[in-house]
Each structure stands twice: as structure tokens, then as C-alpha cells.
Amino acid sequence: KEMSERLTDKAALISTKELHRAVMLVMADRLKATIDRDADLMYHSCEDYIADLKTVQRSLAEANAKRSAYGPLQDLIWQAETFGFHMVEMEFRQHSVVHSRALEDIREHGLHGERGELQPMTHEVLDTFRALGSIQKRNGIKAARRYIISFTKSAQNIKDVYELNRLAFSHPEDVPTIDVIPLFEQLEDLQNSVDVLEEMIKIPEVQARLKATGGKMEVMLGYSDSSKDAGPTSATLALHSAQERIAKWAESHDIDLTLFHGRGGAVGRGGGPANRAVLAQPVGSVKCRFKLTEQGEVIFARYGNPVLAIRHVESVAAATLLQSAPSVEKRNTDMTKKYADMASKLDEAAHNRFLDLLNTDGFAPWFSTVTPLTEIGLLPIGSRPAKRGLGAKSLDDLRTIPWIFSWAQARINLAAWYGLGTACEQFGDLNTLRQAYEEWPLFSTFIDNIEMSLAKTDERIAKMYLALGDREDLNKKVLDEMELTRKWVLKIVGDEWPLQHRHVLGQAIRIRSPYVDALSVTQVLALRSLRKKVDKEELSQSQQAGFIYL
């Protein structure tokens, strides 16, 4: 009866024997009204639209038209439940320091600039919350509610976001509902993550959201910055340990946890086969859910072809379900305990070796000289600048993308492997390393990814780039570690050369290498010219050549 009262003139012309068709026409009109923002006819939420679809479905089922009820109509219901009216949720993200500086600015100058002009960044932060509120008002809370805090250091960072969200609006009823997601990125932050979360759940706004969502909570882990901060070996082990501790903490508080993995793309950014990454997760950290970022440089490779896209999604979904099986969880738990001592020793040695390189006097300018780091920063590509715009100019403020890509351009790929060779050499027990490779998914995935990175390095060409820096001591550290890591990885996997037993990938790299070699040599010549230029016109011409080869 309620449906029939909504019939438009067009639907009313349809025979009463085609009631379902008439109702669907009404729904189509209401969808158009929703797009046009016609308040009288529009759907005010996707839930109302889904309710209408289910009414039609029940009616068809009761009429014994089950093929119609549970065929394409069921697909439409699933699509509506999955995508809503907004298609894809908009997630927001900002650095914790930006929030704290915005609050300091407001306290000093007043919310409306009563005691002086607010900084442009403060206006941008407040406008971000207003944009979030506008999206929610138009498309519902599911369209935009997650707010990620990069470089979360303490629970105060979470409080800052809730305070700014309130300050952005004049009327309390306009303040949008948000779920604040801490992002732990650096080694120290990963180690302190549980302490921060313990304080976080004491915040009233967080408690209210936990109650409203049935205890759902999301925590994000950063693979890129942790790798740049601690080195690939220590970052891998620290992330695994953090996930394990966070999962246990969530279980103890009856929290329905989703871990959001900021990984993908290059191996130095946590990349590699996604399905194997899922299977290597610690017990309790998946529970049939796995959320991760897809980096821009791999989106087309994974989703550009529908067949490949379906295969990739199916592979990750299968791994997610398999990893949640009790037998797999038990295996991962047992292997983590069995090789804990080995992991600890590798971690310490690799971390020390990595820090020794980074702390060598003059490393930062040398790195800028022997790689196209500066030129990458000048390219008008990418969604973010090469360095974080927080005023500092140290290596710490260099974003991970140019850090990793610069080493890749120099055919060194240092960000993926540096320190492991020394760690294995000091550990010395090849049998245990081989056994761990066979039994422990985390270690085997890590070693296989490093072997792939080593297959893409070229010592001959790397030496040409390193010669640009005139630092034999640093060159020796890099080349010695490259050789040592290659030796130990090949021993562990039982290969005579990288990717010997992964024929397809190995052949693909070998076919591509001659073409990349030519580009690399040309780029080295351009960089050599750039490093010597003083005249502005000549410098500009050399830069243009460098951009072309990049």
C-alpha cells in the first residue's frame, strides 16, 4: 500500500498485473530525484533504497518467482549494501604535527583571528573537517568518516583531531561523526602502539564510537616509513610484532579490530605478492578481514585488465580466508615462537648495520649526489612533495617514495635489502636460516622479496652512479653489503643466481634489463653533467635531459 501511494503518472499507466515493474519505475524516479536533490521525492539514505529493493524481493519470493527474486535483483541489493550512494568512501589523512600546530595557532590568534591572522595551514585543516561534514550531510556517514593521523605518537594526537573537528563548526549539530585512525609508522611508534591505544580508548569520543559500532576499531600500520627509519629487516619484524601485540590487546578489550596495512608497490614499501603477505600475518590480526593500500604505481598492473583484477582479488580473498583458519593460525604462532631467538639476533645486527650507514658523516648529501633524488623532487608528478612540508630539511623528513625510487633508479634497491647480509653473517647458522625459510611464512616471504630486489640490482651500473659521489667509504659499505646479502640469500633459498627457480619472473627481468641498462647509462651521463654545471642556462638544459631519462 505504501509503495502504491508513491506511483508516478508514468508508473500508474502500467497494468496492475505489472506491479513490480511499476514499483521499480517509482524507485528509478526517486533515484533521479536523489541525484537532483529533490527533497520531496529523493531517498534520504541508501538504507531506504535497500529497504524498497528488499520489499520487491520478498514480494517476488512470496509469488514463487524465486529466480527473479534472487537473481539480478539480489546482485543489485548486494551492490547497494556495498557501495551505497557514494560508491567509494573518502578517507582523510593528515600529519599529527599539522594538527598540533593548528591548535597552537588558534590558541594564539583566536578561532576567527581575533588576535592576528591564522596561518594558511590552519585554515586548510579546519576546511578539511568542513569538507568532511559536507560529504556526510549529502551522502551519509558511510561516505566519509575515517580520519587517519600520520605519525601518531600519543593519545594526545587523537584528542587534537576531535578538538579541531569541533572548532571547525559554529553549531554542535553540524559537527560530523568521525572515526579517528592512528597510524603507527616509525620503529619507536610501533613499539609504543599498545600503550597509545590503551590511552586512546579512554577518550570520550572514542568510547562513544566503540559503543555505537559494536566495538569496531581500525588501526593503521605504515610499512614505508618504518623501513626507512629502521631498515627492511627490523621494520618487517617490528611490524609483525606490533600486529601480534595489537591483536592480543584488542581481544583482551573485546574490540573488533581491523588492521589497515599501508603497504604495497616496491618491496621497500612493504610490496610483494599480496596473497603471501596475508598468509604471513600473525594470529588474530586478520579474522577474515584484510585492508591495505594499493600504491599508484601498481594499480594499473593489478586492475587495468579485468581478468587480472579478478585473479588478484580472488587470490587475496582466498589467502584472507585461509589465514583465518585455526590450523594456519596455529602454524604461524608456533613458527613465530620457534624462530623468535633467530629473529631477535637478525633484527639487532641488521638494524645496527643500517643505522651505521645512515649515521655516516655526509650520508645525506652523498645520497642526493649519487641518485636522482633532487631531480625526482623537481618532477611535476605524484600526489605529494618529496619532503614533508614541516620546515625541517633532514633525511628524516624525506618521504619514503623518493627514498625508495632514488635507489631503484640507481639500480641498487638498497631500501629493500640493506643490513640482511651482515645479520646473516653474524648469525652464522645456515641450517636454521634454511629451516626458517621452509617453515615460517613471514621469513620465506621476506627472503623471496629480497631475492627479487637483488635480481633487479646491477652492480656494474650501480658503480657508475656511486662514482658521482666521490666517497669511497660509503661506496664500499653499499657494495660490500650488496655482495654479502646476495651470497646469504642465495644460500638460504638454494639458488645459484637470483630467481633461478622462479623462471617467469627471472626471464621477465632478464629480457627487460638491456633496455633499462641503456636508460641508466644515459641518465648517469646526464646526472654527471648536472653535478658539474654552474651556468644557469646549461643547468636548465641538463635538468631537462635528466627529466626525460627519469
Regions found by a protein language model. Name each.
Residues 57-64, 77-81, 107, 133-136, ...:
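Structural signal for hydrophobic packing residues in well-ordered secondary-structure cores
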Residues 156-159, 191-192, 268-271, 508-516:
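Short, solvent-exposed polar/charged micro-motifs at secondary-structure junctions
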